[in-house]
């Protein structure tokens, strides 16, 4: 049984982790921490967990928690996790970090988007935790940087095609939409009900911090610098994410070749579903699950490829993928604890 701690258990992602680990047959939730709610019971903070989770939130004492767990999820803000991960690693605790602190190989790219990195020596040790693409590297790691939600939705459909040389690496555009839970649980004017209900708007055009994360991965896969035009939008939904990605195919690329590349990559994967030709993802069909659905259309005349993906931003885009990473780290079947299915409505 894997003993698990969740640091930052009272945010939306942390709460999803609490739910998933509580229902995981090979893991036991041993500790939950919260700076804001220290000393309060999880079931008091989230009444839906009443009678299910009886843990009390505690301060994040690394040495005390390390004695009780095998794995820790750091569901902490960006710039905070890097202060805790090194000591957990030193204490032989495997770390899955859900912030951006260990998603980058290039410290300069991280620092340009966030701040100075205080644990640069760990960046080469950390593995980017996009499970279906990097599971072999994840399996041998002690530190996983769980990908961002937008990068997950963009990279899963795009990387297999870049690897096969089927798309041009210049002029890639992603038009992405996210539910409001992506903004986190802390109250803010931008996520206030009256500000988002019955509305739809773009935000952070030209300066979203997920762009350098996506560009680093694509550049490494393409073995050349790649820039992505990324336009995020805020949907008046609680959860869910849909990305529409535009790219030009290389000379000679056909629809059949696109499908073959996607199926070769994902046909044996539980959580990535390549839809039949002519069908496209719907947020409703992945909400509450760890699935990523992918559809595509190629205009043979213009060579314009349109990829569409849908995920639940809190699950495949965060907590679900984090648990999938834990499963890989400990040699479990990837779907363990993630047997989640959408409702009919």
Curated annotation (Swiss-Prot):
SMART domains in the cross-refs: Semialdhyde_dh
Pathway the protein contributes to: Amino-acid biosynthesis; L-arginine biosynthesis; N(2)-acetyl-L-ornithine from L-glutamate: step 3/4
Family matches, as PANTHER family: N-ACETYL-GAMMA-GLUTAMYL-PHOSPHATE REDUCTASE, CHLOROPLASTIC-RELATED, N-ACETYL-GAMMA-GLUTAMYL-PHOSPHATE REDUCTASE, CHLOROPLASTIC-RELATED-RELATED
Active site: 149
Protein name as catalogued: N-acetyl-gamma-glutamyl-phosphate reductase
Cell compartments where the protein resides: Cytoplasm
Cellular component annotations (GO), alphabetically ordered: cytoplasm
A GO biological process held by the record: L-arginine biosynthetic process
Catalysed reactions, semicolon-separated: N-acetyl-L-glutamate 5-semialdehyde + phosphate + NADP(+) = N-acetyl-L-glutamyl 5-phosphate + NADPH + H(+)
Single GO term (MF): N-acetyl-gamma-glutamyl-phosphate reductase activity
Recorded family membership: Belongs to the NAGSA dehydrogenase family. Type 1 subfamily.
């Amino acid at each position: 049984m894997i003993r698990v701690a969740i640091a930052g258990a009272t945010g939306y992602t942390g709460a999803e982790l609490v739910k998933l680990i509580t229902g995981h047959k090979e893991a036991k939730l041993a500790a939950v921490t919260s700076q804001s709610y220290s000393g309060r019971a999880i079931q008091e903070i989230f009444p839906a967990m009443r009678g299910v989770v009886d843990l009390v939130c505690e301060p994040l004492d690394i040495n005390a928690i390390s004695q009780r767990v095998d794995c820790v999820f750091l569901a902490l803000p960006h710039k905070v996790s890097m202060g805790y991960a090194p000591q957990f690693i030193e204490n032989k605790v495997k770390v899955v970090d859900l912030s951006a602190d260990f998603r980058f190989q290039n410290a300069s790219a991280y620092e340009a988007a966030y701040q100075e990195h205080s644990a640069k020596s760990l960046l080469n040790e950390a593995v980017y935790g996009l499970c279906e693409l990097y599971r072999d590297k994840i399996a041998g790691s002690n530190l996983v940087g769980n990908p961002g939600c937008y990068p997950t939705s963009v990279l899963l459909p795009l990387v297999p095609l870049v690897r096969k040389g089927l798309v041009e690496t210049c002029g890639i555009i992603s038009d992405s939409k996210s539910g409001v839970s992506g903004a986190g649980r802390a109250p803010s004017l931008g996520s206030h009900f009256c500000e988002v209900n019955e509305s739809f708007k773009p935000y952070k055009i030209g300066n979203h911090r997920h762009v350098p994360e996506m560009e680093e991965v694509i550049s490494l896969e393409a073995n050349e610098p790649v820039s992505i035009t990324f336009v995020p939008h805020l949907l008046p939904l609680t959860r869910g994410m849909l990305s529409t990605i535009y790219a030009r195919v290389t000379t000679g690329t056909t629809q059949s070749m696109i499908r073959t590349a996607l199926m070769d990559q994902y046909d044996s994967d539980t959580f990535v579903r390549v839809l039949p030709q002519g069908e496209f993802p719907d947020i409703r069909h992945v909400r509450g699950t760890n699935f990523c659905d992918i559809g595509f259309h190629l205009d043979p005349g213009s060579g314009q490829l349109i990829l569409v993906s849908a995920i639940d931003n809190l699950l495949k885009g965060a907590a679900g993928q984090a648990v999938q990473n834990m499963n890989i780290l400990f040699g479990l079947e990837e779907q363990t604890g993630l047997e989640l299915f959408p409702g009919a409505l």
